[in-house]
Regions:
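Conserved ABC ATPase signature
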Residues: 45-50, 268-339
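A short, sequence-level motif marking secondary-structure junctions
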Residues: 20-25, 112-117, 141-145, 323-328
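Short beta-strand segments that buttress and anchor functional surface loops
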Residues: 96-101, 125, 311-313
Length: 339
């Protein structure tokens, strides 16, 4: 889970800015919105409010940028991503750090860079403990050789491999060592270097940036009778004019006609893949594009059941399709799982 992020000299973030998911002791209701890992209470969800140009989009952009750096290196466009509020920021270090949990372990991984030069100046990974202490697993400064925690004792074979990786990486100012340690490297479950894989895998698989233009997402929405009652209760609290949300079954042909062929083919490959993974397949998935909303339910090896939503309005004799609603109303359905 995400614990905390820290951003400095990036887009609209000039000074170091933090977002924390650690729950306040003052929160005593909605216990199901929290998760306890060891002695730390973490929030499952977070909502960011702010006026226009307050930096909300740039927070999302940070997650996209951070993941991209880990996967492929600092992108070309990063040269202009430093905070432009002050002239000196062009040559000033930018800092990025995420604190996460993997299993019951807490990690802090980050790096600093001069974005205008796409030059990495430092990188670090710490394991954090409940008593407030931390252990540096590895760090690097500038183009120097990465240094492993001296307390980590490796078998000779693994030690020799790491020494080669670290020696070869010396002088590298354009790549992250975390990335290098996951480039075709294999780790056993007992390897004392497994933290390289754990942190890398978490970042590339658990950071998912979904924007209004994201064409397809896969969510666990269950629009059966019980969930429809809850959704209708929630929708009443918003001034949308919607009086009722209901589902309507459609055929696979209708689904095919409602979306571009490449998208439909991708969806069906995904459904087929999930069916093949299970001996007795049973799952539901929701697809949400900018103007479409479909649910696919699979029970056994029968043809998938496809439904879409229709909406009744207070002052209309006819129902409306999801694509006929305003963008703001459509975005409400993206938040239903959190609400």
């Amino acid at each position: 889970m995400l614990v905390k992020v820290s951003i400095e000299n990036f887009k609209s973030f000039d000074c170091a800015t933090e977002l924390t998911m650690i729950s306040s002791n003052k929160i005593r209701t909605n216990a199901n919105h929290r998760l306890k890992i060891k002695s730390t209470q973490l929030l499952k969800y977070g909502v960011v409010y702010g006026a226009n140009a307050a930096g909300k989009t740039n927070l999302v952009e940070f997650f996209r940028f951070f993941k991209e750096c880990i996967r492929k290196g600092i992108p070309m466009e990063a040269a202009g991503m430093f905070c432009k509020n002050r002239e000196e920021n062009k040559e000033r270090e930018s800092g990025f750090e995420v604190q996460i949990t993997v299993g019951d372990k807490f990690y802090a991984y980050g790096f600093s860079a001069i974005l205008s030069k796409r030059k990495i100046t430092s990188e670090w990974l710490y394991e954090l403990y409940q008593n407030g202490s931390a252990r540096c697993l590895f760090e690097r400064e500038g183009n120097k050789r990465p240094i492993l925690d001296s307390a980590i004792t490796l078998p000779n074979t693994e030690k020799n491999k790491f020494e080669i990786y670290a020696d070869d990486f010396e002088g590298n100012e354009s790549s992250l060592f975390l990335t290098e340690m996951n480039r075709g490297k294999k780790y056993t479950v007992r390897s004392k270097l497994l933290f390289f894989k754990e942190v890398y895998d978490w970042i590339v698989t658990h950071i998912a940036v979904i924007t209004p233009n994201t064409p397809l997402i896969d969510l666990e929405y269950y629009y059966d009778t019980d969930s429809l009652k809850l959704i209708n209760k929630l929708i009443e609290t918003f001034d949308t004019g919607i009086s009722k949300v209901k589902i309507e079954e459609i055929s696979l042909d209708e689904l095919s006609n409602a979306m571009p062929k490449p998208v439909f083919d991708k969806v069906m490959r995904h459904v087929k893949s999930r069916i093949e993974e299970q001996e007795n397949p049973s799952f539901r998935m929701t697809m949400r594009s900018n103007e479409s909303f479909f649910n696919i339910e699979v029970q056994g090896h029968e043809e998938p059941k496809v439904t879409t939503i229709r909406l009744d309005h207070v002052k209309s004799f006819y129902d409306f399709g999801f694509e006929e609603e305003s963008d703001g109303t459509r975005r409400l359905f993206d938040l239903m799982d959190m609400l």
